[in-house]
């Protein structure tokens, strides 16, 4: 039951809701507040605050009733609210929804619904404030083009309507202060779409545009173009706010993507300007940046290119609100006969409710009676207050008498005659009684028909006379086979068509062919009157015609047509006498002179128009004694200066005193144009001003000026709302963190910049299963440690097995840098018998001479001599050897260049000194090369082995081998070198001595050179050649640490690498050379001796030199 009752109430409320009008009854004010930083008070610049008066009467309005305020030319409501309540003393009496027109309608509406708080005893009234922006155009849409004509700069009347109730107010709109001749841009937020409509109008070209490119694109990736909502057109004009008022199509090419919209156009006529607009979506519609393309060529001008970038910011929304008072109506019954209204005392400063008392008379009930008579009578039965009185109304009525008569009309008519003095009225009824009718039809000479009725007296016969024009006649002539002519006439009824048929014998025929203007052939037969000759006309399309007009010396015009055969081309030759020429000189606005010849049609007059730039004008104004003004213009020839002489009577003078910004007083006389009033302006220094800017809690800014007395100090107090803050964190090169606050101007956004020191970085290299390398950087939060993870593919592995003196086996893995080759060295043990049988170290050269390839080698040898307190001196010799393998892979010295440097100092250079005070350092260097023939030296070597420790077999001596050189005829001297080498490997010592004699074509010296070489090693393991790794660093040598001391000025014998470093050894071998043993190093060092020395297990030295010497000697003949 309760549910049914509720549904019934809902049904009744819906059924009884209605539309009411006139609620908004006044337009109280329309004021502008600058919601951003606009430079002028235009209708489309937010925010315009409209204050409207409203009134709701509970006796005529009910809950659920609706009313609507239409607001023409309003674009949107500049508020984040979707509705506003009509309230009085905090009570809501209606709710109004905002419906913005935006780009969809030329008007906005406020649709309101009455609340349940309104009762019949309440009348609420008040005001509502609506923040809004008007629509005066901004795009090429039909809505904006229509609204672009809503207002003009200056005084306008703004009118809203609530049903039939119109409310209006006058307001002044300021014109845009942007120069309309330049490029024009505009952006406008569309709140319902959360998009922005952006407009770009090209700069003005008064004579039109030859070509151009225009458009806009996002700058920082925070904007997207909506290519489905674009307008491109040319406008004939702009309104006072620089918006198009029309849009016409023209020829252009459009390119659009989400990043930008661009158009390229050509040939825009004078008086028009191209424009493009589009919807854009921005990350923040209140702050975004656009880059504009702006290229154009004005007709008769040069190509212009002026791109630019604009940053757009939004405006501050306002709030809508309402307030009012409540009026309570009370009713009281009185004994008066009429209703009266009275207002009880009301103090608006103290009372919140105004009470209106309605004084009503005692209610009555009316009873109506009737009687036969003439007058109406009233009688009242009274009653006390609280009851109902009775009013009796006695209404008269009449009786009727009917009279019937006949008449000649065709209908029956009834007429009632009311008797004002009696109760009996008369009803007259007229019944039709027609006469019999006779109709007569006759023809007459007129071209139209008439009908005339002649009415006889009642009871006689009426006559209807119809007069018809004669029938039309159609004459048909046809041929028949007879040789004579016949004529037959067929008469039709009146109004029809009579037919006359003439039958003729056939005519003879003549055929004629002619040309006509159509592109096809027709055949027409023209039948002549009987007895004549019929014509058959064949019309052929004409030949094409070429017309040539030329001028000739005669004074008359001739036209000659040369007819070609059918299907060819006819030629029309027009010869015209030359036209007369009229030359006109005129001035124009440009700074240069042009001559234009306008060719008239033949027989006309050609015009030569010379346009000259206007002469500069010098105007001289002088006063004279007369009371009137005169102006005299003295015109000079073109290119000179015109003079305008103005003579004026003296002006009246007015003196004005004002303040200005300087600290001193001045008197200035401003001379007005003649006939006006001159002004004497006295400027006094103003009071000093102190400006104070402070922030407050409100969302808007205010400026208050406190003016002090003259000579005091004025105060300007600016109160700004607090700025928004954006915090940015970035890294910098310092080791500490800083926080900087950049305060923007009021109304913008402050920036808090946090600078953090860079994080420490830990690099980790690991191997993985892939065949390629990757580098991944893991960024940690500020103050922590970043990680660089390098993943390398696994290195290939080489396994080497060696024997050592320990009793156990071990394996060592030498990991190369990524991209190199890892080495696994297995150290295996040997039995006691194997150790005793292996009493001498056995060195075997596994690399023969012809399998070693040296490409480039550079060596520097330094001799240092120190004598007591006299200091030291040294000589540096650098040698570069370039070898090229032949077809049997035997290295051959192709050129050698030595450079010698001698220096001395009181301090000895760094290095290792022998007992004799001589030191050698070797390093790589690059010198200039020159070709020379190598020599074959004579070599004597002696090798002595001395063993200590477990091996007691004593020294061994090898036989000497002498190799005599085949001396060159140009050899001037020989160099004898004695070498002594000592090697200490664990408990064994190997000493090698030798003497070398060789010729040298490079060093001119008569003194023999002596070289001592000492090498020490601390391990019996194989000495590995140090190589450069792929990364450019040095690879560590094996367990050996050789040290060499050499004395030499020139050394063409020892080419192995020596080092003064006790822990590392350097080598100049190529990185791809195989590992060598000590014996291999010695072999390599003796290459230039053209001999091979091999150490065997017994301590002997096997020297192979004879065949090698002969081979190199033979090869040297071809170098």
UniProtKB/Swiss-Prot annotation:
<feature type="signal peptide">
    <location>
        <begin position="1"/>
        <end position="17"/>
    </location>
</feature>
<feature type="repeat" description="ALS 5">
    <location>
        <begin position="510"/>
        <end position="541"/>
    </location>
</feature>
<feature type="repeat" description="ALS 3">
    <location>
        <begin position="438"/>
        <end position="469"/>
    </location>
</feature>
<feature type="compositionally biased region" description="Low complexity">
    <location>
        <begin position="1057"/>
        <end position="1077"/>
    </location>
</feature>
<dbReference type="GO" id="GO:0098609">
    <property type="term" value="P:cell-cell adhesion"/>
</dbReference>
<feature type="glycosylation site" description="N-linked (GlcNAc...) asparagine">
    <location>
        <position position="579"/>
    </location>
</feature>
<feature type="lipid moiety-binding region" description="GPI-anchor amidated serine">
    <location>
        <position position="1098"/>
    </location>
</feature>
<feature type="glycosylation site" description="N-linked (GlcNAc...) asparagine">
    <location>
        <position position="471"/>
    </location>
</feature>
<dbReference type="GO" id="GO:0030448">
    <property type="term" value="P:hyphal growth"/>
</dbReference>
<keyword id="KW-0325">Glycoprotein</keyword>
<feature type="glycosylation site" description="N-linked (GlcNAc...) asparagine">
    <location>
        <position position="845"/>
    </location>
</feature>
<protein>
    <recommendedName>
        <fullName>Agglutinin-like protein 3</fullName>
    </recommendedName>
</protein>
<feature type="glycosylation site" description="N-linked (GlcNAc...) asparagine">
    <location>
        <position position="759"/>
    </location>
</feature>
<keyword id="KW-0732">Signal</keyword>
<feature type="disulfide bond">
    <location>
        <begin position="227"/>
        <end position="256"/>
    </location>
</feature>
<feature type="repeat" description="ALS 2">
    <location>
        <begin position="401"/>
        <end position="432"/>
    </location>
</feature>
<feature type="region of interest" description="Disordered">
    <location>
        <begin position="892"/>
        <end position="1077"/>
    </location>
</feature>
<feature type="disulfide bond">
    <location>
        <begin position="205"/>
        <end position="298"/>
    </location>
</feature>
<feature type="compositionally biased region" description="Low complexity">
    <location>
        <begin position="998"/>
        <end position="1022"/>
    </location>
</feature>
<feature type="compositionally biased region" description="Polar residues">
    <location>
        <begin position="947"/>
        <end position="965"/>
    </location>
</feature>
<comment type="similarity">
    <text>Belongs to the ALS family.</text>
</comment>
<feature type="repeat" description="ALS 13">
    <location>
        <begin position="798"/>
        <end position="827"/>
    </location>
</feature>
<feature type="repeat" description="ALS 9">
    <location>
        <begin position="654"/>
        <end position="685"/>
    </location>
</feature>
<dbReference type="InterPro" id="IPR033504">
    <property type="entry name" value="ALS"/>
</dbReference>
<comment type="function">
    <text>Cell surface adhesion protein which mediates both yeast-to-host tissue adherence and yeast aggregation. Plays an important role in the biofilm formation and pathogenesis of C.albicans infections. Necessary for C.albicans to bind to N-cadherin on endothelial cells and E-cadherin on oral epithelial cells and subsequent endocytosis by these cells. During disseminated infection, mediates initial trafficking to the brain and renal cortex and contributes to fungal persistence in the kidneys.</text>
</comment>
<dbReference type="GO" id="GO:0044403">
    <property type="term" value="P:biological process involved in symbiotic interaction"/>
</dbReference>
<feature type="repeat" description="ALS 4">
    <location>
        <begin position="474"/>
        <end position="505"/>
    </location>
</feature>
<feature type="compositionally biased region" description="Low complexity">
    <location>
        <begin position="894"/>
        <end position="929"/>
    </location>
</feature>
<dbReference type="GO" id="GO:0030445">
    <property type="term" value="C:yeast-form cell wall"/>
</dbReference>
<feature type="repeat" description="ALS 8">
    <location>
        <begin position="618"/>
        <end position="649"/>
    </location>
</feature>
<keyword id="KW-0843">Virulence</keyword>
<feature type="repeat" description="ALS 7">
    <location>
        <begin position="582"/>
        <end position="613"/>
    </location>
</feature>
<feature type="glycosylation site" description="N-linked (GlcNAc...) asparagine">
    <location>
        <position position="543"/>
    </location>
</feature>
<dbReference type="InterPro" id="IPR043063">
    <property type="entry name" value="Agglutinin-like_N_N2"/>
</dbReference>
<keyword id="KW-0964">Secreted</keyword>
<keyword id="KW-0449">Lipoprotein</keyword>
<feature type="repeat" description="ALS 10">
    <location>
        <begin position="690"/>
        <end position="721"/>
    </location>
</feature>
<feature type="repeat" description="ALS 12">
    <location>
        <begin position="762"/>
        <end position="793"/>
    </location>
</feature>
<feature type="glycosylation site" description="N-linked (GlcNAc...) asparagine">
    <location>
        <position position="987"/>
    </location>
</feature>
<feature type="compositionally biased region" description="Low complexity">
    <location>
        <begin position="1035"/>
        <end position="1048"/>
    </location>
</feature>
<keyword id="KW-0336">GPI-anchor</keyword>
<dbReference type="Pfam" id="PF05792">
    <property type="entry name" value="Candida_ALS"/>
</dbReference>
């Amino acid at each position: 039951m309760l549910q049914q009752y509720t549904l019934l109430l809902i049904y009744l409320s819906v059924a009884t809701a209605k539309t009411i009008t006139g609620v908004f009854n006044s337009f109280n004010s329309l004021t502008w507040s600058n919601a951003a930083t606009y430079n002028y008070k235009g209708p489309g610049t937010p925010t315009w605050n409209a204050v409207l008066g409203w009134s709701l009467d509970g006796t005529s309005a009910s809950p659920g009733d609706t009313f609507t305020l239409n607001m023409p030319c309003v674009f949107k409501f500049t508020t984040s609210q979707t509705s506003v309540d009509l309230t009085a003393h905090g009570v809501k009496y209606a709710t109004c929804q905002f419906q913005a027109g935006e780009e969809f309608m030329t008007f906005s509406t406020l649709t309101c619904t009455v609340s349940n708080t309104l009762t019949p005893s309440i009348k609420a009234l008040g005001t509502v404030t609506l923040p809004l922006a008007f629509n005066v155009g901004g795009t090429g849409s039909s809505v904006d083009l229509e609204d672009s004509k809503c207002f003009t700069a200056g005084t306008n009347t703004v009118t809203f309507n609530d049903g039939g109730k119109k409310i209006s107010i006058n307001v002044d709109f300021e014109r845009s202060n942007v120069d309309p001749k330049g490029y024009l841009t505009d952006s406008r937020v569309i709140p319902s779409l959360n998009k922005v409509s952006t407009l770009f109008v090209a700069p003005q070209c008064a004579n039109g545009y030859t070509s151009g490119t225009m458009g806009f694109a996002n700058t920082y990736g925070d904007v997207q173009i909506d290519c489905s909502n674009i307008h491109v057109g040319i406008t004939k004009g702009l309104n006072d706010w620089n918006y198009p008022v029309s849009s016409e199509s023209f020829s252009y090419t459009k390119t659009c993507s989400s990043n930008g919209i661009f158009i390229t156009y050509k040939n825009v006529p004078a008086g028009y300007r191209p424009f493009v607009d589009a919807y854009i979506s921005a990350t923040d519609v209140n702050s975004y940046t656009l880059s504009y393309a702006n290229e154009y060529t004005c007709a008769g001008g040069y190509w212009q290119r002026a791109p630019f970038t604009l940053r757009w910011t939004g405006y501050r929304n306002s709030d809508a609100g309402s307030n009012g008072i409540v009026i309570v109506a009370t009713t009281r019954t009185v004994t008066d006969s009429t209703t009266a209204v009275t207002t009880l005392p009301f103090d608006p400063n103290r009372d919140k409710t105004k009470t209106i008392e309605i004084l009503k008379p005692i209610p009555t009930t009316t009873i109506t009676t009737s009687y036969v008579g003439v007058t109406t009578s009233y009688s009242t039965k009274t009653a006390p207050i609280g009851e109902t009185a009775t009013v009796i109304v006695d209404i008269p009525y009449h009786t009727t008498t009917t009279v019937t008569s006949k008449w000649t009309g065709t209908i029956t008519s009834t007429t009632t005659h009311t008797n004002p003095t009696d109760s009996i009225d008369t009803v007259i009824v007229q019944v039709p009684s027609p006469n019999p009718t006779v109709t007569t039809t006759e023809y007459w000479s007129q071209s139209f028909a008439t009908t005339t009725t002649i009415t006889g007296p009642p009871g006689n016969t009426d006559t209807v006379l119809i007069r018809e024009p004669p029938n039309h006649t159609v004459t048909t002539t046809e041929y028949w086979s007879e040789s004579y002519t016949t004529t037959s006439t067929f008469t039709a009824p009146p109004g029809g068509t009579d037919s006359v048929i003439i039958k003729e014998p056939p005519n003879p025929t003549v055929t004629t062919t002619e040309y006509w203007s159509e592109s096809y052939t027709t055949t027409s037969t023209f039948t002549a009157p009987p007895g004549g000759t019929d014509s058959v006309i064949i019309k052929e399309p004409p030949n094409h015609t070429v017309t040539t007009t030329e001028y000739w010396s005669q004074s008359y015009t001739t036209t000659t047509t040369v007819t070609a055969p059918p299907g060819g081309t006819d030629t029309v030759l027009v010869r015209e006498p030359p036209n007369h020429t009229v030359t006109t000189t005129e001035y124009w606005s440009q700074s240069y002179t042009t001559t234009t010849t306008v060719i008239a049609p033949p027989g006309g007059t050609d015009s030569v128009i010379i346009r000259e730039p206007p002469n500069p004008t010098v105007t001289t104004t002088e006063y004279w004694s007369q009371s009137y003004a005169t102006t005299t213009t003295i015109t000079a020839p073109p290119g000179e200066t015109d003079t305008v002489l103005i003579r004026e009577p003296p002006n009246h003078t007015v003196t004005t005193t004002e303040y200005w910004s300087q600290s001193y007083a001045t008197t200035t006389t401003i001379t007005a144009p003649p006939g006006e009033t001159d002004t004497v302006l006295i400027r006094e220094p103003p009071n000093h001003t102190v400006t104070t800017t402070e922030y407050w809690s409100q969302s808007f800014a205010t400026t208050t000026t406190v003016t002090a007395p003259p000579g005091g100090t004025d105060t300007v107090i600016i109160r700004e709302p607090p700025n928004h803050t954006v915090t940015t964190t970035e890294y910098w090169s310092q080791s500490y963190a800083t926080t900087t606050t950049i305060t923007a101007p009021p109304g913008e956004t402050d920036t808090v910049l946090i600078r953090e020191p860079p994080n420490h970085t830990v690099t980790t290299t690991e191997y993985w299963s892939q065949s390629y390398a990757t580098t991944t950087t893991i960024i940690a939060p500020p103050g922590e440690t970043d990680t660089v993870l390098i993943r390398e593919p696994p290195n290939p592995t080489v396994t080497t097995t060696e024997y050592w003196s320990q009793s156990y086996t071990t394996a060592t893995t030498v990991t190369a840098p990524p991209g190199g080759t890892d080495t696994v060295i297995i150290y295996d043990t040997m039995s006691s018998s194997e150790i005793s049988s292996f009493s001498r170290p056995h060195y075997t050269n596994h690399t023969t001479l012809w399998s070693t390839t040296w490409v480039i080698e550079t060596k520097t040898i330094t001799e240092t001599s120190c004598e007591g307190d006299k200091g030291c001196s040294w000589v540096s010799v650098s040698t570069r050897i370039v070898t090229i393998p032949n077809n049997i892979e035997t290295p051959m010295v192709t050129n050698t260049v030595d450079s010698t440097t001698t220096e001395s100092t009181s301090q000895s250079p760094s290095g290792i000194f022998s007992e004799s005070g001589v030191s050698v350092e070797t390093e790589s260097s690059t010198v200039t090369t020159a070709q020379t023939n190598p020599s074959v030296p004579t070599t004597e070597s002696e090798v002595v082995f001395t063993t200590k420790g477990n091996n007691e077999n004593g020294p061994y001596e090898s036989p000497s081998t002498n190799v005599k050189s085949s001396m060159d005829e140009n050899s001037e001297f020989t160099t004898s070198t004695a070498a002594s080498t000592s090697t200490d490997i664990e408990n064994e010592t190997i000493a090698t001595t030798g003497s070398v004699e060789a010729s040298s074509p490079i060093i001119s010296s008569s003194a023999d050179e002596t070289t001592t070489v000492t090498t020490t090693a601390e391990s019996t393991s194989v000495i590995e050649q140090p190589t450069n790794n792929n990364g450019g660093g040095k690879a560590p040598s094996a367990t050996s640490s050789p040290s060499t001391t050499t004395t030499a000025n020139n050394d063409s014998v020892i080419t192995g690498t020596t080092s003064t470093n006790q822990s590392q050894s350097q080598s100049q071998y190529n990185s791809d050379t195989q590992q060598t043993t000590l014996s291999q190093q010695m072999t390599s060092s003796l290459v230039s001796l053209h001999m091979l020395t091999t150490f065997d297990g017994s301590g002997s030295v096997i020297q192979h030199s004879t065949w090698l010497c002969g081979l190199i000697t033979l090869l040297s003949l071809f170098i």
